[in-house]
Amino acid sequence: MANWFGGVKEFKASVLYFILKQRYKIILHSNPNEPSDLVFGNPLQQARKILSYQNTKRVFYTGENEAPNFNLFDYAIGFDELDFNDRYLRMPLYYAYLHYKAMLVNDTTSPYKLKALYTLKKPSHKFKENHPNLCAVVNGETDPLKRGFASFVASNPNAPIRNAFYDALNSIEPVAGGGSVRNTLGYKVKNKNEFLSQYKFNLCFENSQGYGYVTEKILDAYFSHTIPIYWGSPSVAKDFNPKSFVNVHDFKNFDEAIDYIRYLHTHQNAYLDMLYENPLNSVNEKAGFYQDLSFEKILDFFKNILENDTIYHNPSALYRDLNEPLVSVDDLRRDHERLLSKATPLLELSQNTSFKIYRKAYQKSLPLLRAIRRWIKK
């Protein structure tokens, strides 16, 4: 692994490791000088690490809103709807997070049922103890209509559209904030799913917009038996049943979306119809994931990688000194703020009346100045 968020421990907990170990013996290391069948990497702020692996098949994997560069990587797994033959697989982050949910509900007290593959591990007995409200609402022991209005959990404040929608919705009806952004509780919730299950809606906006960019946020809402209010991927209805959530992209503006949310909130039958819709779209009356995404499809993708000896990446493309630090998003933001601070006096000067008069006089004198320069050159 060139770089993986959380290192070896997190990779071993990932769905990719879980799937691959069903067929392959996996030996992990991060030494570019040792032989490897493939190397995982992510260019976000760490592109130089992958460049050390010159003669190894590179696999791009991301949980962020970024597209793969096929000059730098041989294969890629991402959010975008790309058709690049057998070199690309679309596997949004929500699908990866289904694995964590499955591991969580391998429990004798869980209201959710698991496929046999996940029941091989000895089950726990703590789910209901840790999720009493979630279990009660899923099992029909409490009325889903008699819950709070809406919940919101976010840790990244740099999401202006998400923040603006929260403020607009919160001005109509109080929205409980359990994260570090727009917190209303006085503390950050530790059990997100249990918290979400106590409300009728969950505001699950992505931090940025991108076609196909669907993360775990909408999955958390479904898992918590609450209706997602979603914004992020304009094509999200390909991934999830549009009758099962509020898609803010369907409305002209925030006001229209909020009016619809208020309608659901005040009309019991409409709310319950949406709540009990299958989250997945159906093809031939069978619910399934978009583009038939499955463990088998993912295994076939890696089977092709491992059996194909071709290395596609261009060693000369995007090459840079491995010791040269890359520019990060924070660096760019600081540079922008520094340049803006230097430009501010000039901007203020440009609004000054005297400055405008001198500038206008200078512009009128330009033809004469050019003529003088030509005469001097002669």
Where are the regions that the model predicts?
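Pol beta-like nucleotidyltransferase catalytic core
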Residues: 1-24, 30-35, 39-41, 45-54, ...
